[in-house]
Amino acid sequence: MKTEIITSDVLIIGGGTSGCYAALTIAEQNPELKVVIAEKANIIRSGCLAAGVNALNAYITEGRKPEDYVDYATKDANGIVRKDLLLSMSQGLNRVTAKLEELGLVILKDENGKYVTRGNRNIKINGENIKPILAEAVKAQKNVKVINHVNITDYITEQDKVTGAYGFDVNEKIAYIFSAKAVLCATGGAAGLYRPNNPGFSRHKMWYSPFNTGAGFAMGILAGAEMTTFEMRFIALRCKDTIAPTGTIAQGVGAKQINSLGEVYETKYGITTEERVYGTVAENQEGRGPCYLHTEGIKEEQGKDLLKAYLNMAPSQTLKWIESGKEPNEQDVEIEGTEPYIVGGHTASGYWIDDARRTTLKGLYAAGDVAGGCPQKYVTGALVEGEIAAETILKDLKQEEEGQQSEGQASKEQLEKLAQAVDQEYESCFAEKKSFFGTEQIEEAMQKVMDAYAGGIGTNYRYNEKQLNIAEEKIDQLFALTKDLTAKDTDDLLHIYEVKERLVVCKSVIAHLKARKETRWRGFGQNMDYPGTKDDWDKKAVNSVYENGKIKILFRDLTQTPDFGQKGGTL
């Protein structure tokens, strides 16, 4: 393969929500620094915002304060959060919202010029073009270089510091070596670990981006970064088949969750995110399904508004209504839970970070869905974390410069030597060797294992330790098969690394599920060996570090705030 070495001050891996905003922040505060964004897709329509959104779900509305949002997120996660992270995120929500509007995002306003709210924490937007707005702002920065269609596979470490990363072009046989003084991981969460709602050709009709494979998680795990709360999986309550969001209906028109008998069941089980999922699963198990959002009988105008609202983010739901011949006010909307995802924007799973968004690896920072401890980020929270991480990078680089500390970057000779090794690693996948399985077969087998033995849809999100032991054994067997996978082109090479990434994340998920010996979130998974909650787990984070080929479990006190500073990795 052809190899290219690119040097910068800051490398941002992932050009999604937080990655873009981090680049903007650095460009505005220090336009002399050279920033490179390595993006797997194309920055214009990449990441979770690719299809657009119709609301900003994290905003401090009139009469509320940031501490209220912290309380809400803490209760929703049943206490397993880092309040320091939640507070610093909440304090920036309205600031980044104002910046988005300044960049061109249309935020709906009432006759008095105030934002139109949707519930206590949301505001309505016309957000089909939210990602292009961010991307164009980034592309306008002279000191920011965006390299699209590059899949990053590993970090580069020198002198116990992350000094870059390497990857390959997904369209051409080019290997990239990125050297940087600071690296921000903003690669998003992990989808595709479990068997999805829809089979075959429609398997990517899912809640979370199917192209978010957990790459940032996997790189961090293998590099020895401390991870947190992978057992807190996210399961979304969605419109059946289309997997379209339900919040637009529930909050937009006040639709209640009802069973097949027409009974409102949400008050019976609770109204936190996971309780809404649990109630739906329980009603179906007890023979009172299907379950619905009760929209039949709403005003005709409200029905028309719903048809329009879904065009901004999930047009398939609008098409389903149209094809049925009935509008939203003429029929209820059937709902279901999705397969589990690992996503730090909704749960507390991800890198273990300090309040400045430093990871336990020196020189490496994390923001957005890849960062743990701070659930309920949504779009604006991811923006804030990108901003915080960027400002920390600026501060740390300035301290290094003033203290004349060693930057820890590899020399030209070291980079050239690394380039040869990377080329050999990738080229080995193109070698002719006998492989009985392809990436798609291994991925399907992985999803079947996770569904059956690690609490997927097929078991109503239930699992026990015996099942998890089986899952661990089978995932190890599947990972061993990946060494024989071969590629005809870079697209095949991409799929090889994606399935490897998912398998690494699966191993961590299984280890975390085994470690939390209670059922903290019934809707996100029930440990049938430990079906209740335990008081001694109320302030305990389940963390892990990959050492000598094994996942080592650590327990951290959530009330203690870590500070990794310039040293990295110390509590």
Model-derived segments and their meaning:
Residues 219, 225-335, 340, 383, ...:
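An anion/pyrophosphate-binding glycine-rich loop and adjacent beta-alpha core
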Residues 154-171, 177, 329-371:
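FAD-site-proximal beta/loop scaffold in flavoenzymes
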Residues 1, 5-8, 22-25, 29, ...:
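Glycine- and aromatic-enriched mobile tails/lids
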Residues 10-37:
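N-terminal Rossmann-like FAD-binding beta1-loop-alpha1 element of flavoenzymes
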Residues 45, 96-182, 186, 190-197, ...:
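Conserved redox-cofactor binding core of oxidoreductases
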